[in-house]
């Protein structure tokens, strides 16, 4: 049985076939998007191919899952390789996979019954693969965006901040309690 990631009919056919054998799945792991070129050596053809195997295949999978009745899936894990930088000053080494995260974030909100999770591996090394397997087996709680870099696990966190900590980071004009007025410097732009 083979399917094309950019073909929605193939994806539906696959899920219909799976449903007949196992109407309940512990999870689906999408790995098609991890084989992209590094950003610096990306060509137009490679970008088109990575979009087809990455974002389009994820879209077709999610749409097929949403349209398939009689198949229960506990978890949908979308795995990327070096698509997310850990520091806002860094560039993602494999930027072509970033749309998978964008679509995955939409799927998390729009298809809440699918329990989509995004996992980014830094190098796809043996220890990261072992961490990914542990992550998938454990269910990993409520986290839906995870970066596994070596043996370290990173997730988003909102942390309370005191006004004293923010002072100096936020420009003083934003802190001023007095009203202000915005003016258009060049109309039409």
Model-assigned labels for residue ranges:
Residues 145-189:
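Short N-terminal strand-loop motif that marks the start
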